[in-house]
């Protein structure tokens, strides 16, 4: 802490001492000038007087001349060195300019490439938009056509409905006409009944008269007339019944309800008629019984014969009607079968249309076979229907013949007229039924067409829904884009915040410079108070305690590493034992097991259990290592807290110094105490360096151990490959090896990715070890200053923790992968050794042996499962733009396939469409097309958004380039202003005869300007950072390091030359300054390694500004003050140390602000 404060306050102390010494030297120089003027006057007087000079005066003059000559030679050497430095800086500046020009060319090429890609993407987007617009226009045209067809179909359906209604009205008129004719028939029957009643009344009157009065001739005539009337009545009644039944059957086909009503009326009339007939027959039977007559018997016989004939005709008509109904039922069944077959045919056609894009031959063959079978069924059903129609026509012709035969029996004119009317009505009914069937067929066709158009309309609605879904997806993607924009805005705000932070740091640096100038102008720094010393001592004690804790944790870490090495050795030993177990297991896998294998399998099981226990032990040790790493992190956090307390104490100490300035003598006394404290800190840092050396040695041992394990793994893989070849050669000899080979193939497939995993983890451990070495070297270079060494130690410990974690993980994965190799080797490695001839075992041993083999295989499978779990996590991700392009291509292909399917569906619409059950399949095709269109639209929208983001990024890149250019323009002006002031101060002080070691004040000013330029350069480099140029920058950095080493050598030589003149100073300040110079040189090396780019630009600026200072030294000195002595050197030796101190100040301010 005190060493750091000394480093911070050292420039102020030097400047105050130099001011005091300059004042004293000015007084002495004035006195010397007066003396020299007096001596010159005395010499001239003496010369005029002819007197000679004394020897003492000659010696003084000679000493002055020699001193002036020596100073002149030194100034010439320094001028030559500065000229060389200026040339080197000019070369570096030209290299930097070339690098910036090359970088600008690379940027322009990248911008041109991006612009070309943007143009190509815009052209693709325009083409896709044109295609989409054309597709939309085609779909709209198809929509208009479908709507026109739907309207025409609706008009046709309305026309058919009106025709159907007119047909129904005509049929209703015919029905009314038939009802009127039936009423006329009923009226005629009433007349006949009246005549019969009158005849019966006359007969009764005649029978009531005496029998004697009646003659046999009259009686016989009456009986004949009565018989004739009865026969006529019965015939007419039967004929009426037949006509009524035929009429009811015909009218029943038109209107079932009206036919039922007429049938009920006829049945009621028949019941009344039979009652009347039975009453009349009873009366006649009574009369016959009273007066039997042969003529009456003849009439009765004829009546019975006629009744039997009518019953026969009636039965035949009923049989024909039953056959006709059966044929109609069969026809309906055949029509239903035909419809079902048509539906199946349509389903098959739809399936064919659906799977036309598929490339599977088997599915196409199955569909063709199904279509052939359905076509055959349809043809058979058509043939059956044709046969049924022929049978129906034959039956109708037979029915007509029977009706014609029936009409021959009718002798009455009125009955013939009725039959003619009935035939006409029957023909009209047949015509009406045919027309009705035609209308039904037409109606079915119209319904099918209407269904097709409805399906098409549904398809169009689905397309509209798909467009809506695509719009929803567009909104979702827009929301995602907004989120990306927000993230980008957040990152941009973060960049602005960092830039603002850099600006604040620059402002703080300027304030610090102003405060330093005020301190230089006012009073020297006083000695610290007792309280501040006590606080510093307590903080140092806490720091030592934390370092001891850190050492203890490092020792524990080393012990854990040793235990890990022991575990690795145990693992190798278990590996050898596992190889022996594999050989024994191969002996067990033979088709005829040998005796004594049961014990070997038991030993194998015990060894596998030991291996599992060892793995669990290893995992426990890894958990302990993780806990120790966490404890180490806690210790580092405590160190960070102490560092913050130190920073706060330093700030408060600065404030106290500004508020309470004292004499300069106190500052000189406090310098010794700070030097002692800095020595203590140096010893502590050396102890830390020794500790880091030990850690590095341990890490190298671990790396060598891992390399040896990797070599052993490669050797085992080579042995495994040889065993596999031997197994393939011996496969022909025994069939049981096939099972072992299959299990080996599975285990080897799981082993290959585990090998890759092991290699990857080993590569990561090597990289982490390299990072650890880099960080450790950085700790070695920065071990002289507390802050730098602390930062590097924290980074080194973090890198060491990471590398240690990766080594532990790599050892775990290596162990897992080795377990997989050992489990897979069990199926092949010792097969050759198992071919030895031994005696076969007993059946009991065979059974036990099989059980043990099963257990061993289960154990090995469990070990393989553990390694497969770790392999599943390694999957590579593709870039988003490539995914989108691939997805776009797939969507284009699917869209083309859907367009082909749509065209085929439109062609199928011209053919007779499928029934209503096929709507589901058509809807599935429509939904699929809609999903494809949605995916295509989403991909197009996503591509457009990516293009927009790309344009925004290009615009931001241009803005960053403009800012970079502005910063470069501002930088030279600021540097020139600062350098002009510093050059004036340097020339004034050198003209007054200042010594070599006292030119620290202008150097501190130049360091301030260097800090300003460094801040601006860091802002520039922040924007110039590019991942693509890291390799080139690494090579350039190596060259620059060589150049800087040469410059350091030149500076050290200059320091050695000028060291003789610094002997006259007191001992303590010389020692303090020499140690500080060494620290500063080491810190300078560290800064040169970390910030080479920024220092190159600073050197360029220094060279550009120092060259005019060296060219015009006398003019600036003459403008200030004339001196009789020669020009002293412009730059002196402590310049490098002050530059390093200024760099440390800048780092301290950066850390406190962060």
Swiss-Prot record:
Gene3D superfamilies: 1.10.287.1490. Residues 14-32, 1077-1109 have a biased composition (Acidic residues). It is a single-pass membrane protein. The chain crosses the membrane at residues 1130-1150. GO terms for cellular component: acrosomal membrane. It is found in: Cytoplasmic vesicle, Secretory vesicle, Acrosome membrane. Residues 1031-1058 have a biased composition (Basic and acidic residues). The modification Phosphoserine is found at residue 52. Residues 696-733, 859-974 form a coiled coil. It comes from the Eukaryota. The keyword Transmembrane helix applies. Keywords: Coiled coil, Cytoplasmic vesicle, Differentiation, Fertilization, Membrane, Phosphoprotein, Spermatogenesis, Transmembrane, Transmembrane helix. The keyword Phosphoprotein applies. May play a role in acrosome formation in spermatogenesis and in fertilization. Restriction fragment length polymorphisms (RFLPs) in gastric cancer showed loss of 5 kb fragment in comparison with the corresponding normal tissue. This is Coiled-coil domain-containing protein 136. It comes from Homo sapiens. The lineage of its organism: Eukaryota, Metazoa, Chordata, Craniata, Vertebrata. The gene is CCDC136.
